[in-house]
Amino acid sequence: MEDPFEEADQPTTEPGMVLDSVEAGDTTPPTKRKSKFSGFGKIFKPWKWRKKKSSDKFKETSEVLERKISMRKPREELVKRGVLLEDPEQGGEDPGKPSDAMLKNGHTTPIGNARSSSPVQVEEEPVRLASLRKAIPEEDLKKRLGSTGSQPNSEAESVPENVPKPPLLPPKRPLSSSHEASEGQAKDATSSGGTARFIISTSITTAPAATTAATSLAKTVNLSVTPSPAPRTLPAAPASTNTTATPSLTHMVPAKQPPIPPPKPAHRNSNPVIAELSQAINSGTLLSKPSPPLPPKRGIPSTSVPTLESAAAITTKTPSDEREKSTCSMGSELLPMISPRSPSPPLPTHIPPEPPRTPPFPAKTFQVVPEIEFPPSLDLHQEIPQQEDQKKEVPKRILDQNFGEPHIPSRLPPLPLHIRIQQALTSPLPMTPILEGSHRAHSLLFENSDSFSEDSSTLGRTRSLPITIEMLKVPDDEEEEEQTCPSTFSEEMTPTSVIPKLPQCLREEEEKESDSDSEGPIQYRDEEDEDESYQSALANKVKRKDTLAMKLNHRPSEPELNLNSWPCKSKEEWNEIRHQIGNTLIRRLSQRPTPEELEQRNILQPKNEADRQAEKREIKRRLTRKLSQRPTVAELLARKILRFNEYVEVTDAQDYDRRADKPWTKLTPADKAAIRKELNEFKSSEMEVHEESKHFTRYHRP
């Protein structure tokens, strides 16, 4: 890529210019000289330019890091610094404040009064949500909205009505501006529309049966619980299927109740999810109420038909379920959506145990997403025993609590999750009853909302524990769903608490882990991607643990092991086996031919010592005869069989001493003449000479 600065230099070095400059003379330096250093421009200028430009990515990353760091700080410290608002329960402030604080936290802006800062938040929130939306492919939105076609026409119609009103921001806006929703009807309209569309898209994706059933539950709850907002969206709700009812319900609730968390689905830790849920609860437990608990969802396919038939029963069920939800997942408007959508077990606010939840759609779907993805194989199985007893007992309890004080919890929602968890860590009192055997899972999962508001400690543990329980037992989903529906409706049934078989040590470990993990909601949303990745990692961790527990539960008993494994043998049995093996080996060896047979077939020759000696004597005789018949050296020389070099005697060097005093070193002239004569004879008679060179020799005359 050419650098712009270099291009700026280049025009000077056109060919014509170069010639002119050369002709111009010595005074004007030739322009070509400039180009000599253009290489440096290539190297340095773009570098400087890039360096000066501030990187958006860098800024975003730094913001994300700041948020993450802030997440690690305890809530009290953040409240002191003014980053977070105190919770309504603690400071008696507006329920909207926690969500505002969260929003501000996300933006890292100081927080004023929730109401006073609400306009600003409304402005900021759309921006943040817009960025969120961008991350979420618009095609997904369209698909989700398009999927409404599967629902009845009334619902589809209601959805389009909602959809055109808000572009992309409004949906986010209602969620974020739901804090201020009560203040402006116009805002409400847009927010409800946006949320409706938003939630509809999310909820639609789930199985229509489950959605409709859960939505009808939510709708009935809405009618009973939230009268004032109901008229707003309820017209659409009755007309539309339950799914639309759920969105409308969620919108109505935001419209009615000021604080609703920004829609960012970020479940970064348990914190964001918890933050979302706790905020939703803060904004109004109404929201959590309308959402039937996930356990009912599991039975929802069958539940959907009766949902509308008796509002009272459903409302009782829904409140109970909602109570469960609030206890387990602190359902906010998100939860209503969630409940219809996923047949998965109660959404634990506590993410560490939320193993298989990876949002199916873009993070937009909020909590719904995590829930939806619980692998039914793990969760549903274990949960259903619990859920049955929980549903049986919970309706009663929730009837007492919910109907005794239906609107009080909505106004004064239970303490936020992080506070409850801290209390749980500090005060072990609530846990002692819960820890006892059969009722442990049940009470942990669905402790009264009263106990929640009073002892947040139960919530922390409840939150963490439900999931451990969820994932351990896995009966078939369909069977369990059928069972759960009737149990949900029969409120007076005595609770048969079925506890998944999780070893006590494992349970305690998971409780500890979940407590430590769910430190408390920091009330803002993180970037979706980070949240998803973190969540998935956490989910996988929990899933691994739970699968381990499952495997431990499914280990075969000793008799089964004995059946399948190599049985232990007594000494007698081992001896028998050895004897059998020995017999087979002996039989095979016995089949080998004996030496006699081999001799008969001339394969093996019989040998005696006398025979061997005779053979040796014969060999000697033969050899001696041959040696005696050997010709002498003279004969061989005469017959020219031996050559000169073959019969000359050779003396070893060590034997041959050259010292002068030795006689053999002194050759007499006679010895020398004899040697010469022998050599000449050899040359003349035996040594071959080439024909052409014979005339050079003394003995070979040409």
UniProtKB/Swiss-Prot annotation:
Residues 508-518 have a biased composition (Acidic residues). Residues 163-173, 342-362 have a biased composition (Pro residues). The modification Phosphothreonine is found at residues 358, 432. Keywords: Actin-binding, Cell projection, Cytoplasm, Developmental protein, Neurogenesis, Phosphoprotein, Repeat. GO terms for biological process: actin cytoskeleton organization; closure of optic fissure; enteric nervous system development; negative regulation of integrin-mediated signaling pathway; neural crest cell migration; neural tube closure; positive regulation of catalytic activity; regulation of cell cycle. InterPro entries: RPEL_repeat. PROSITE patterns: RPEL (PS51073). SMART domains: RPEL (SM00707). Residues 106-120, 147-156, 301-318, 484-497 have a biased composition (Polar residues). It is found in: Cytoplasm; Cell projection, Lamellipodium. It comes from the Eukaryota. Residues 1-37, 72-194, 222-363, 469-536, 592-615 are annotated as: Disordered. The modification Phosphoserine is found at residues 116, 118, 131, 147, 270, 291, 342, 344, 427, 443, 453, 464, 514, 516, 557, 590, 628. Regulator of protein phosphatase 1 (PP1) required for neural tube and optic fissure closure, and enteric neural crest cell (ENCCs) migration during development. Acts as an activator of PP1 by interacting with PPP1CA and preventing phosphorylation of PPP1CA at 'Thr-320'. During neural tube closure, localizes to the ventral neural tube and activates PP1, leading to down-regulate cell proliferation within cranial neural tissue and the neural retina. Binds PPP1CA and actin. Belongs to the phosphatase and actin regulator family. This is Phosphatase and actin regulator 4.
